[in-house]
Amino acid sequence: MGVLGEIAVYKYLGVSYELTDNYEANQVDEGDLHYKGLIYDIKTDAVPRSYYSKLYDGSISNYEKYGCRVFTAKHLHHLKKYTGGLIFTAIEIPDNAKLTKVEGTIRDAILNVKSVIIIGYAKQSDVTSHEPTWYAPKDPKSPSLIKYNSLNYIFHHCDGQGHAPGSSI
């Protein structure tokens, strides 16, 4: 699935690309994009349709599900090789994707993706200047916090704090 985000970024930037087969071999890559002397890791999220449209038009709140981009803290040791930082992308999947998932296969919705949102990027310093967290930002209408499955650095694409600003690379 991540390769879809990679292709979208390559096409957007007008750079040629050759896809590597290190996914199946579980090999760690040396970065997904080498551009203007910098190396980037491209992160792609599969986002249910109802959230994807809000992500697309920028109306998603940071406390909503899929409102933040995440970089897992357990991969922090890889960050040093991504000299340009992280690029965040998203593809749309059906709202009922969990109900229709068949183990060991690729969903038709992913095979038939027609668009990818290039959300923005975060520099190394954006990641390292923040503390990782187990929790999503608090919803002001709810007393409970949503817990992630792992410790993460989180970024909201339009929080005005310089995180994943979506400006040119």
Spans of features found by a protein language model:
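Nucleic-acid endonuclease domains
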Residues: 1-34, 43-169
